[in-house]
């Protein structure tokens, strides 16, 4: 019973975040600030969301999903997706399918290395995330594309190792 209550609360929090997004969607984000068009989801919560309860409940037409709590982050200079993230990706696939989204996978890096190298590394990360989504069952027609932002859109400072780790990430842009 406690798990059902927790799942219901998490589902409601997700809906609240989506509705908050809908209200603030008209604003254009700037580089280092947290983007207002981003739905940040704690991955532990995302693993437990009952996707069927979210279907058709004010799901926005466009939203960017970033899984927080140091999830789907990459090691320095790596484009490999850790198997511990596969469950989270399966739930993302279900969310995409239930809400009839298409996804653009966007790769990001920290600021170490040249801009040219980081753009290529970000693209490899996005391509590997796309490949894993397809391997885990997402239909190819649900993939809108892959992009790299390299080091151009940090979410944390690049002056510390902790900040750089947060910047090495994947974002999923969902569009209806």
Question: Model regions: which residues?
Answer:
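Bacterial N-terminal signal peptides that target proteins for export
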Residues: 2-9
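Hydrophobic helical h-region of N-terminal Sec-dependent signal peptides
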Residues: 10-18
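Generic marker of residues within folded, mature protein domains
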Residues: 15, 55, 64, 93-95, ...
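Structural recognition of the beta-strand scaffold that forms the well-ordered cores
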Residues: 66, 73, 104, 145, ...
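Glycine/serine-rich loop-strand microenvironments at binding/catalytic pocket rims
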Residues: 86-119, 175
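Periplasmic OmpA-like peptidoglycan-binding domain that tethers envelope proteins to the cell wall
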Residues: 108-176
């Amino acid at each position: 019973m406690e798990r059902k209550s927790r799942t219901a609360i998490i589902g409601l929090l997700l809906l609240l975040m989506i509705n908050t997004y809908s209200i603030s969607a008209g604003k254009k984000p700037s580089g280092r600030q947290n983007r207002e068009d981003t739905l940040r989801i704690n991955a532990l919560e995302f693993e437990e969301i009952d996707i069927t309860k979210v279907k058709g409940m004010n799901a926005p037409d466009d939203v960017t999903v970033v899984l927080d709590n140091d999830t789907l982050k990459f090691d320095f200079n790596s484009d490999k997706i850790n198997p511990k993230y596969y469950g989270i990706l399966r739930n993302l696939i279900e969310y995409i399918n239930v809400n009839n989204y298409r996804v653009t996978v966007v790769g990001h890096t920290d600021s170490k290395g040249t801009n040219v190298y980081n753009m290529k590394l970000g693209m490899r990360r996005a391509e590997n995330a796309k490949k894993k989504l397809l391997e885990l069952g997402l239909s190819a027609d649900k993939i809108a594309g892959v992009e790299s932002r390299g080091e151009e859109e940090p979410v944390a400072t690049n002056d510390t190792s902790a900040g750089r780790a947060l910047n090495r990430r994947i974002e999923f842009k969902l569009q209806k």
